[in-house]
Amino acid sequence: MNSEIERRRTFAIIAHPDAGKTSLTEKLLLFGGQIQVAGAVKSNKIKKTATSDWMDIEKQRGISVTTSVMEFDYNDYKINILDTPGHQDFAEDTYRTLTAVDSVIIVVDGAKGVETQTRKLMEVCRMRNTPVIIFVNKMDREAKDPFDLLDELEEELIINVRPLTWPIESGPRFKGVYNLYEHKLNLFQPSKQVVTEKVEVDINTEELDNQIGAPLAEKLRGELELVDGVYPEFNVEEYLKGEMAPVFFGSALNNFGVQELLDTFVEIAPSPRPTKTEEREVEPDEPKFTGFVFKITANIDPNHRSCIAFCKICSGKFSRNTPYYHVRHDKTMRFSSPTQFMAQRKTTVDEAWAGDIIGLPDNGTFKIGDTLTEGEKLHFRGIPSFSPEMFKYIENADPMKQKQLAKGIDQLMDEGVAQLFINQFNGRKIIGTV
């Protein structure tokens, strides 16, 4: 059981809108062998849209509006990715997702640096001491000076940083990155499908001059010396405490720097961590199953108007058709068709372990924050609820459809997307979102 839990890596990809989260997710799935061709996040009519953007609105607008869950195997690790929305209209979904992950990759646009949404999300990570890796994206376009970017990351995100790869120029002059973790040079070839080759180079030899030219080689040596002098050695313990963030540079769209990120990630990222409940702390290697619902989504399958409750397993092993105790309802339930996800595609699973995220069919029995156990009364802490910031009245244009409207509003409330208020003077309904 322990070996199964040890090989789990559950993380979220977060960023400001359009920094390249979904493009990075696509490339990680490409390496995991889950998709043969990476989709593009484009607003125009490209045939292949991103796997994690499965809603119609996401395909039309080229943005993510709901958190997608995808899982794949890579180098004997089982990886669960949650691709989150960056747009602040859908922020509550993202904040809640952060309670279900053990680590986070933050994507930063190399030209724009740290933006407002990134700052807010980092605060949530800091509250939970979540380990963070930073990926500076779009280096194949004109970007800020890497040293300026690192200073900005330290100041804005209030965390120590340590670059593990270093860019050689940016924009049209972008030559590649030098991997400080493995001491290898990766030369850039713009390609959306091909994986780039690595060249082992000692930076003090002429081999480096031959690969990238003498002026750039000289500049790179000086910069790497400065990096080693200014930034502390990378310390895995500090990373796991959420005090230090390793930084990678690359271009997700051109598939560059992504494999270094993935290889280092599976090596250093934490396996499932203990989860706090109001009663006690739950360790992932406990023999008994516990889990909590952090998200509910309707209409994943267009042919069925079904709801799915996303459940994060916190300890033990989940088995299909086994009775489990629903703490809020105070009754046992069994699940005949639990599923695992590839965004919209789902497959039925017979068993799942701590760290995994499973989908449970929901016909109104679940609410966000519900706990499932083998009989113990536990209440998981830290599913945040936020005060709404935007309010709108709801008007029903067709009085004959009063029932459908009421049902639709209930569904939104259950999904935790919005909160409902009723004006006590005139009974009008008001929806509030974060």
Where are these regions (language model features)?
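Structural and coupling elements of P-loop NTPases
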Residues: 1-434
